[in-house]
Regions:
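N-terminal DNA-binding module of tyrosine recombinases/phage integrases
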Residues: 7-108, 265-270
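Conserved tyrosine-mediated DNA breakage-rejoining catalytic core shared by Y-recombinases
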Residues: 13-15, 159, 208-260
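N-terminal core-binding DNA-recognition domain of tyrosine site-specific recombinases/integrases
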Residues: 67-156, 165, 187, 276-280, ...
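Active-site/catalytic core of tyrosine-dependent DNA strand-transfer enzymes
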Residues: 83, 173-177, 226-229, 251-296
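DNA/chromatin major-groove-contacting recognition/catalytic segments
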Residues: 109, 178-182, 232-238, 338-357
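Basic, Lys/Arg- and aromatic-enriched nucleic-acid-binding interface segment
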Residues: 122-126, 130-132, 145, 149-209, ...
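C-terminal catalytic core of tyrosine-transesterase DNA break-rejoin enzymes
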Residues: 127, 145, 194, 198, ...
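Catalytic-site neighborhood detector that most strongly recognizes the C-terminal catalytic loop/helix
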Residues: 170, 227, 255, 280, ...
């Protein structure tokens, strides 16, 4: 591989031709290398990447992985994935050849990562460690599926951390009514929490709502988007899942409340966000209401659990509840099984009748 010295500034550069994925010949020029060896190494790595050679560096393969995967993901999903790759994975493996990383290397990496702590000094949770390992494993799986790598060393090494069941907190109707009574003098937060509790929608779905999503004649609320704050910008995305696209029937009192709220909003356009709040503002409002009312502290997302709990207590099926909140019925059954009344005794009694006892 030839490298050339720039007579003007003394640095090195490479210039070469290669065949791209369309089969067309392309020319590449790269300047600014301090040494001839660095210039040649860059050319070699570039060509291995273009040829999908698994002897390329891990860092080069991650660039391919980003090119392949990023367009398929929502921006917030990719940013979460990219942060882990950049801070927890690349610093350890970037200079290694993709094909030479072993399960032993992954175990050594796991042991190193386990020693890391948050800025507060706390250890990382088992959930987070599992997620970090999963991101590494995803990279190797991608290399196996599309680039000819034979073995996933991360899978062979075994997982790091474990998925912990998250504690499910929720308010009873009585607790919620105490809380919302304390929010009466904060109109925007009051109506936001009313929608969250009585409709069971997600936080991002709430913050993306516009007047066009409400049909007061039919008393319905349309959910077809979600709000995120990403890289300092407000971003409206599609909802979390396909099932999340839904139309929710609102109770009469909530319809009346929202019409009253709209009258308070000056210059409201059909596509304006009706709750121009941040997630932090909602969280702060929740903390205020909990303290003022004396009810137990729960997360914003737990209002969704509270809505599901209320519907279960009212006797609705997992299918009906799943359709309302945008979950599959099997997921509702799995997550909230402990809240559904048992029917085992009723089943046994009916089997007795069938047999003739």
């Amino acid at each position: 591989m030839a490298a050339f010295k720039d007579k003007k500034n003394g640095s090195w550069y490479v210039q070469f031709r290669y065949t791209d994925w369309r089969g067309e010949r392309q020319q590449k020029l790269k300047r600014g290398f301090a040494t001839k060896k660095e210039a040649q190494a860059w050319e070699r790595e570039f060509l291995m990447q273009k040829q999908a050679d698994i002897n390329m560096s891990f860092e080069s393969f991650v660039a391919l992985y980003e090119k392949d995967v990023k367009p398929k993901l929502k921006l917030n999903t990719w940013l979460s994935k990219e942060h882990i790759i950049r801070t927890k994975i690349l610093p350890y493996f970037k200079k290694r050849k993709l094909s030479e990383i072993t399960a032993r290397d992954v175990i050594d990496w796991q042991n190193e990562i386990r020693q890391h702590t948050k800025s507060s000094g706390e250890s990382y949770s088992p959930d987070y460690l599992k997620n970090v390992h999963t991101q590494l494993s995803c990279i190797f799986n991608h290399a196996i599926k599309y680039y000819g790598l034979q073995i996933n060393p991360a899978a062979k090494a075994g997982n790091m951390g474990s998925e912990q069941p998250k504690e499910m907190l929720f308010w009873t109707k009585e607790e919620y009514l105490k809380f919302i009574d304390a929010m009466m003098d904060k109109p925007m937060l009051y109506y936001a929490f009313e929608i969250l509790y009585w409709c069971g929608i997600r936080e991002g779905e709430l913050l993306a709502l516009t007047p066009a999503d409400f049909n007061f004649e039919k008393k319905t609320l349309r959910i077809n988007k979600s709000y995120q704050r990403l890289q300092g910008k407000d971003v409206i995305t599609t909802p979390k899942t396909k099932k999340s696209n839904r139309v929710i029937q609102m109770p009469d009192f909530l319809c009346d409340e929202m019409q009253d709220y709209f009258k308070q909003l000056y210059g409201l356009e059909p596509d304006s966000r009706i709750f121009p709040l941040s997630k932090y503002a909602l969280k702060r409002g929740m903390a205020f209401g909990c303290k003022a009312s004396g009810v137990k502290v729960i997360r914003i997302h737990d209002l969704r659990h509270s809505h599901v709990s209320l519907l279960i207590n009212m006797g609705y099926s997992a299918v009906a509840i799943g359709n309302r909140v945008g979950h599959e019925s099997v997921e509702i059954t799995y997550r909230y099984a402990h809240l559904f009344p048992t029917v085992q005794k009723e089943m046994a009694d009916k089997l007795n009748v069938e047999r003739g006892n």
